[in-house]
C-alpha cells in the first residue's frame, strides 16, 4: 500500500473502490502495515466498495427524519422478479422470460450508470429497443406508485440527500482503482464535494521489473505452468503477493482448480483429505445451486412436487444431508441398487415410497422421514401462497426430512447452509413484487435464484489470487501472471446490450458497446497489468482444439522468452520415483473351496470364456454393475415373456401330434391365457411397467409371436417336449452350477434335442471355439444331456423365425447344421468329435475358474470390453491403452 494512502486512512479519510475484492485487498494491506508498525490495536479502516458506501448513506437516511419520503430499496431478486412480471404481462408469447428480464435489467443499469435515458429517443429504436422503452416506462410507473427504487438509481437518490446534516459523510474521500469513472459515479462524487467532502482519485503507483511473453502449447499447459510458477515464487518467498489473471475465468475455472490443486497439494485427492488448505483463491464464485448441500435441498423439494429422474432420487436417497444418513449410509446404498432393478426412469414421492416398501433394506429412518415428508406435502405444500408463506413451508418441509443431516457440517457446507437461509429470506421478500403462486412455480423461482447467486465460501487470507480481468484493477502484486492472451481472445469482442441502440452505446463510450470501446479497454488493462508487479508474465496458448493461435497484438511489444520452472511431479509419479514398490501377481485368485456354491449358472462359463477377470469379479466378488432404470420393457424382459408363454404352451400341449390336433380357436385361447399369466407375473415384479392398453398391446404381441413360432414347429417331424424351464444341477471342472434349461425335446425315434430360446439374432458359430460366446447349450449337452443328438437356438423373432443349431443327423431339425461344415471353421469334423471338444473346452474353462484364474484377458479387445461393467476394476485402459470410443465408456 502506498504510504501516503495509509496516512490519509489513518487521518480518517474514507476510501471507495470499484469492487469488494479490491476493498478487502486494501484493508488487508492496511492491517498488515499496522501490525508491522507494532501497533496492538487501531481503528478499522473505512474502506468499502462504492456500492456499499452508497447503501450505507441510504441506510443513514432511512433511519433519519427524511425516511418518510424515501423510496424503499428493492433487492436484486426483487428487481428481477418485477422485470419478469412486467415482460410476461406485456408479451405473453416470449418464452425465455427470465433470460430476457436479466438483459433488460442490465440495460436499465447501464442506462443509469452512463446517463443514457435522456438520449434514448435521439437514436432509432429497433423492436427490442421499443420493447425496452415500454417496459422501462411501466417499471418506473410501478416504482413511483409503490415508492420503490433499485440499485441502478440508488446513487441518484442518495446524491440528492447528501446535503442533509443527518447523512454521515467523511471529511475526505478517495476513489481508488477506478479504471474509468462513469457519469453517474462522477455526479455522485460531485454531490459529495458540494456537501463538503473533499473527493480525490488515486490508484497504485507504477512498478518496474521483469516483463516477458510466454507461448504455451495449449490452455492446459498454460494453466499447469502458471501453477508451477506460482508455487515456485511462493516457495522462494512465503510473503509474496502473487496474482493470476484469467480473462475467461468462468470458462477455465474447473481446470484451474483441478490443476492448481494438484500442483500445490499433490495428495489433495487422497481419501480422507476433504478440504486441504490450498494457498490459492479463485475469485469467481459458483452458482449456489451447484453446492451439494443446496442441491440436495432442491432434490427433496422437487420430489415433493412432481416426478423427477430416478438418478436424482437416487442421489437424494444417498445424500449425507438427510436425517439418518450416517446411520444408514451402507444400507441406503444397498437399497439404491435394489430399487434400480424395478424403478422407472422417473419417479414420484409416492411411487418411491412404494418401491422402498417392497424391499427389506433396513432403512427405517429413511422410510420414516420420507413418509413424514409425504404427509407434510399433502398438509402444507398445496394451493397458491405468497412467497413468504412458501419460504416458511419449504423450511419446515426440509426440517421434516432431516435436512441438513445428522453429521457436523464442514466449513464450506456450513457457509453454504447459511447462504441457503439468506436465499430463503430473499425469496420471502418477494411478497413486495409478486402475487401468490403454486408450489411448483415457487420452487422453480427459488432454484433460478440459487443459480443466479454466485457463492464463494470465505477462506483465510492466501498469497495466490486467481482473478478475472476486471478484478485485478487497482491491486498490487509482487508477481503477476496473465494468461489466455491469444489473438482470438484478447481483446475480446464487443458485447453490446441488445435492448439499447448500438449507436448510442458506441457514442456514449460503453467499453463493451463497440469493437473500438473493447479495444480501448483492453489496451488500458494490458498497460495496467504491465506496471502492477515486479515480475509480469503474459502468456497465450498456441493451439485451441484444431486452431492455431498467435499472441495478441496488444502484447506484441513484450519480448517473448522461455521461462525456467521447477518440474513438480504428480502424487503418482512421486510414489513411483521413490522406488519403494512391491510387485504382486494379481492374475491368480485363491482357488474355490471344494463344494463351494457359485451363483450365476451358465453365465459363469460364458463370462470366464469372455475374460477370466470378468468372471472372477462378477461371480466371486459380486462386482455387479448398477442397473439403469428403463421405461417399459427392455430386451431381456421381453425375451423372458416369450420364454414364459412358450413354456406354458408346451406344458399344456406336450407333443407335436397334440399341436397338430389343436384347433385355431383353442390354440388362440391357450396362448392368450399364457400371455395373460406372463404379463401378470411381470407386473407383480414391476407394477408400473405395463398398465392399461400397454398391457393389452404386449399380450397381443406375445400371442402373435408364439402363434408364428408354433407354425414353424408344425413343420417338424413328430416329437415330445420332455422338459420346459427345467432346473438342472451341472457338475463340470470342479464347479457345481445351477441353471434353468429352456427345453428338451425327444423325437418319435428317441433322439433328444436341447433347445434355448433367443429373441435376438442366433448363430451356431457362437457355440464353437475354445472360448465360445454362447456356451450354455454345449454345457447342458455335456453335463445333463450327454446322449442328445442336437443343440439349437430357437430364434423367436418377428419375420425371422428359425432354428439355429448343430445336429448329428440332418433330418432331426429344420435348418440345423451337420458336421463337417466348411462354413463353420471352428467346428470339429464330426458330431462325436465336436461333443468331445465341447467337453474338454468347457471343462478347461470351468477348471480355470475353480482354480482362481483371474487374468485380464478379454477375448476380443476392445469389443469384449465395450459394455463390461468391471472396466474401472481391471483397469484395462492402463493395461492396453484407451482405444474404446468415448460414448461406450
Language-model features: where?
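Polyanion-engaging groove/track-forming segments
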Residues: 1-660, 664-665, 676-685, 689, ...
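RecB-family 4Fe-4S metal-dependent nuclease core
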Residues: 402, 406, 411, 546, ...
Amino acid at each position: 500500500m502506498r504510504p501516503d494512502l495509509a496516512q490519509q486512512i489513518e487521518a480518517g479519510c474514507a476510501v471507495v473502490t470499484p469492487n469488494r475484492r479490491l476493498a478487502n485487498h486494501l484493508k488487508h494491506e492496511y492491517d498488515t502495515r499496522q501490525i508491522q508498525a507494532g501497533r496492538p490495536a487501531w481503528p478499522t479502516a473505512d474502506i468499502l466498495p462504492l456500492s456499499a458506501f452508497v447503501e450505507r448513506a441510504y441506510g443513514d437516511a432511512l433511519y433519519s427524519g427524511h425516511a418518510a419520503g424515501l423510496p424503499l430499496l428493492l433487492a436484486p431478486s426483487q428487481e428481477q422478479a418485477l422485470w419478469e412480471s412486467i415482460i410476461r404481462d406485456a408479451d405473453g408469447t416470449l418464452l425465455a422470460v427470465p433470460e430476457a428480464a436479466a438483459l433488460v435489467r442490465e440495460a436499465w443499469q447501464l442506462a443509469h450508470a452512463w446517463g443514457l435515458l435522456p438520449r434514448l429517443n435521439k437514436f432509432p429504436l429497433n423492436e427490442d429497443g421499443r420493447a425496452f422503452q415500454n417496459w422501462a416506462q411501466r417499471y418506473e410507473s410501478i416504482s413511483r406508485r409503490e415508492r420503490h427504487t433499485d440499485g441502478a438509481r440508488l446513487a441518484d437518490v442518495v446524491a440528492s440527500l447528501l446535503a442533509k446534516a443527518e447523512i454521515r459523510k467523511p471529511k475526505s474521500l478517495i476513489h481508488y482503482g477506478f479504471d474509468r469513472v462513469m457519469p453517474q459515479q462522477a455526479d455522485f462524487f460531485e454531490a459529495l464535494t458540494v456537501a463538503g467532502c473533499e473527493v480525490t482519485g488515486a490508484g497504485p503507483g507504477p512498478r518496474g521489473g521483469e516483463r516477458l511473453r510466454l507461448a504455451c502449447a495449449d490452455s492446459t499447459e498454460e494453466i499447469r505452468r502458471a501453477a508451477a510458477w506460482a508455487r515456485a515464487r511462493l516457495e522462494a518467498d512465503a510473503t509474496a503477493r502473487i496474482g493470476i489473471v484469467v480473462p475467461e475465468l468462468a470458462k477455465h475455472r474447473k481446470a484451474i482448480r483441478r490443476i492448481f490443486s494438484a500442483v500445490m497439494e499433490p495428495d489433495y485427492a487422497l481419501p480422507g483429505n476433504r478440504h486441504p488448505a490450498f494457498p490459492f483463491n479463485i475469485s469467481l464464485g459458483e452458482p449456489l445451486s451447484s453446492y451439494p448441500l443446496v442441491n440436495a435441498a432442491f432434490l427433496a423439494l422437487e420430489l415433493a412436487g412432481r416426478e423427477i429422474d430416478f438418478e436424482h432420487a437416487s442421489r437424494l436417497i444417498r445424500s449425507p444431508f438427510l436425517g439418518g444418513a450416517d446411520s444408514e449410509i451402507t444400507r441406503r446404498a444397498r437399497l439404491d441398487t435394489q430399487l434400480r432393478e424395478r424403478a422407472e426412469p422417473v419417479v414420484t414421492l409416492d411411487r418411491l415410497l412404494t418401491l422402498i416398501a417392497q424391499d427389506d433394506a433396513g432403512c427405517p429412518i429413511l422410510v420414516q422421514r420420507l413418509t413424514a415428508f409425504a404427509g407434510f406435502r399433502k398438509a402444507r405444500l398445496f394451493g397458491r401462497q405468497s412467497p413468504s408463506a412458501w419460504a416458511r413451508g419449504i423450511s419446515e418441509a426440509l426440517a421434516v426430512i432431516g435436512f441438513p443431516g445428522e453429521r457436523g457440517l464442514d466449513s464450506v457446507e456450513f457457509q453454504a447452509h447459511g447462504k441457503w437461509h439468506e436465499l430463503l429470506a430473499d425469496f420471502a421478500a418477494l411478497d413486495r413484487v409478486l402475487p401468490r403462486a403454486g408450489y411448483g412455480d415457487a420452487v422453480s423461482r427459488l432454484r433460478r435464484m440459487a443459480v443466479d447467486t454466485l457463492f464463494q465460501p470465505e477462506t483465510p487470507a492466501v498469497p495466490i489470487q486467481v482473478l478475472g480481468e476486471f478484478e485485478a484493477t487497482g491491486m498490487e502484486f509482487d508477481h503477476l501472471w496473465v494468461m489466455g492472451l491469444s489473438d482470438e481472445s484478447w481483446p475480446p469482442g464487443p458485447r453490446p446490450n441488445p435492448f439499447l441502440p448500438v449507436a448510442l452505446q458506441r457514442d456514449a463510450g460503453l467499453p463493451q458497446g463497440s469493437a473500438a470501446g473493447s479495444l480501448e479497454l483492453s489496451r488500458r488493462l494490458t498497460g495496467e497489468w504491465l506496471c502492477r508487479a515486479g515480475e509480469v508474465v503474459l502468456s497465450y496458448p498456441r493451439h485451441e482444439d484444431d486452431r492455431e493461435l498467435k499472441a495478441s497484438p496488444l502484447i506484441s511489444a513484450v519480448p517473448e522468452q522461455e521461462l525456467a520452472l521447477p518440474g513438480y511431479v504428480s502424487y503418482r509419479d512421486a510414489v513411483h520415483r521413490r522406488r519403494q514398490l512391491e510387485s504382486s501377481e494379481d492374475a491368480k485368485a485363491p482357488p474355490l473351496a471344494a463344494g463351494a456354491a457359485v451363483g450365476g449358472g451358465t453365465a459363469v462359463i460364458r463370462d470366464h470364456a469372455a475374460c477370466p477377470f470378468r468372471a472372477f469379479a462378477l461371480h466371486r466378488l459380486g462386482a455387479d454393475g448398477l442397473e439403469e432404470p428403463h421405461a417399459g420393457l427392455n430386451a431381456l424382459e421381453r425375451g423372458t415373456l416369450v420364454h414364459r408363454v412358450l413354456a406354458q404352451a408346451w406344458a399344456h400341449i406336450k407333443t407335436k401330434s397334440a399341436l397338430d390336433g389343436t384347433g385355431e380357436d383353442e390354440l388362440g385361447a391357450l396362448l392368450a391365457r399364457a400371455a395373460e399369466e406372463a404379463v401378470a407375473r411381470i407386473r407383480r415384479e414391476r407394477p408400473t411397467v405395463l398398465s392399461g392398453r400397454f398391457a393389452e398391446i404386449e399380450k397381443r404381441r406375445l400371442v402373435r409371436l408364439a402363434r408364428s413360432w408354433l407354425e414353424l414347429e408344425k413343420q417338424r417331424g413328430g416329437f415330445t417336449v420332455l422338459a420346459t424351464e427345467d432346473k438342472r444341477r451341472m457338475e463340470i471342472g470342479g464347479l457345481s452350477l445351477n441353471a434353468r434349461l429352456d427345453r428338451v425335446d425327444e423325437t418319435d425315434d428317441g433322439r433328444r434335442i436341447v433347445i434355448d430360446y433367443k429373441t435376438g439374432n442366433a448363430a451356431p458359430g457362437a457355440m464353437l471355439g475354445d472360448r465360445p460366446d454362447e456356451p450354455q447349450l454345449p454345457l447342458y449337452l455335456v453335463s445333463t444331456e450327454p446322449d442328445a443328438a442336437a443343440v439349437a437356438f430357437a430364434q423367436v423373432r418377428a419375420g425371422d423365425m428359425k432354428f439355429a443349431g448343430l445336429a448329428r443327423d440332418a433330418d432331426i431339425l429344420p435348418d440345423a447344421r451337420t458336421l463337417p461344415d466348411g462354413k463353420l471353421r471352428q467346428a470339429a469334423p464330426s458330431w462325436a468329435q465336436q461333443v468331445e471338444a465341447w467337453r474338454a473346452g468347457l471343462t478347461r474353462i470351468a477348471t480355470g475358474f475353480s482354480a482362481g484364474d483371474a487374468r485380464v484377458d478379454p477375448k476380443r479387445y476392445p469389443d469384449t470390453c465395450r459394455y463390461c461393467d468391471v472396466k474401472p476394476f481391471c483397469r484395462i485402459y492402463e493395461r492396453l491403452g484407451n482405444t474404446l470410443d468415448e460414448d461406450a465408456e
